[in-house]
C-alpha cells in the first residue's frame, strides 16, 4: 500500500480555529470534525487528525479524533486507537466513513 501525505496550512492547536488538515491516500480531511476516507480508513478530527489505513490512529492535537483501520476514538485524551483495538469507534472491519 502506498500512502502519501501533504500537510496544508495548520492553525495553532491552542486556538479554537481549525483549518485545513492533511490528505492521505485518496481522501482529504478539511476543517473541523470532517472525515477523510483515504488509505483504507480515514480519520476525523481537528487541526491535524491523521487516519491511516494501516491500523494507526494518531491524534496530534489532543482535541481531534482519528480512526485507524478498525475504530478508536481519541477525543480529548490525545490518543487514537487503531488496529483491531477498542476505543469508541463506531465501526470495525470496514472503512470508517462517518462520525
Swiss-Prot record:
Pfam families: Coiled (PF05710). It comes from Dictyostelium discoideum (Social amoeba). PANTHER family: HSSA/B-LIKE PROTEIN 1-RELATED-RELATED (PTHR31059), HSSA_B-LIKE PROTEIN 1-RELATED (PTHR31059:SF5). This is HssA/B-like protein 41. Belongs to the hssA/B family. The lineage of its organism: Eukaryota, Amoebozoa, Evosea, Eumycetozoa, Dictyostelia. One of its GO terms (biological process) is sorocarp development. It comes from the Eukaryota. Residues 1-29 are annotated as: Disordered. InterPro entries: HssA/B-like_chaperone, HssA/B-related.
